């Protein structure tokens, strides 16, 4: 089993662990119900999600098999 050659100092350990910080989630206001929600996600309160389409959508024909 591998063992370290030298002891890591407390300062070196602290410098390594300083990168373990958490980030605050980026919340925006829902345009439909004005509650806070995550970006690019469905609103948990009202279920609203704005999708912008560029250009016209092509219709898809669904064939039913009888």
UniProtKB/Swiss-Prot annotation:
GO terms for molecular function: structural constituent of ribosome. This is Large ribosomal subunit protein bL32. SUPFAM superfamilies: Zn-binding ribosomal proteins. The gene is rpmF. GO terms for cellular component: large ribosomal subunit. HAMAP family: Ribosomal_bL32 (MF_00340). Keywords: Ribonucleoprotein, Ribosomal protein. NCBIfam families: rpmF_bact (TIGR01031). GO terms for biological process: translation. It comes from Acetivibrio thermocellus (strain ATCC 27405 / DSM 1237 / JCM 9322 / NBRC 103400 / NCIMB 10682 / NRRL B-4536 / VPI 7372). InterPro entries: Ribosomal_bL32, Ribosomal_bL32_bact, Ribosomal_zn-bd. PANTHER family: 50S RIBOSOMAL PROTEIN L32 (PTHR35534), LARGE RIBOSOMAL SUBUNIT PROTEIN BL32 (PTHR35534:SF1). It comes from the Bacteria. Pfam families: Ribosomal_L32p. Belongs to the bacterial ribosomal protein bL32 family.
């Amino acid at each position: 089993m591998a063992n370290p050659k030298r002891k890591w100092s407390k300062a070196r350990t602290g410098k390594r662990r300083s990168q373990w910080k958490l980030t605050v989630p980026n919340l925006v206001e829902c345009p439909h119900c004005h509650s806070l929600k995550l970006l690019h996600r469905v609103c948990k309160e009202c279920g609203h999600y704005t999708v912008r389409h560029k250009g016209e959508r092509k219709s898809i024909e669904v064939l039913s098999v009888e």
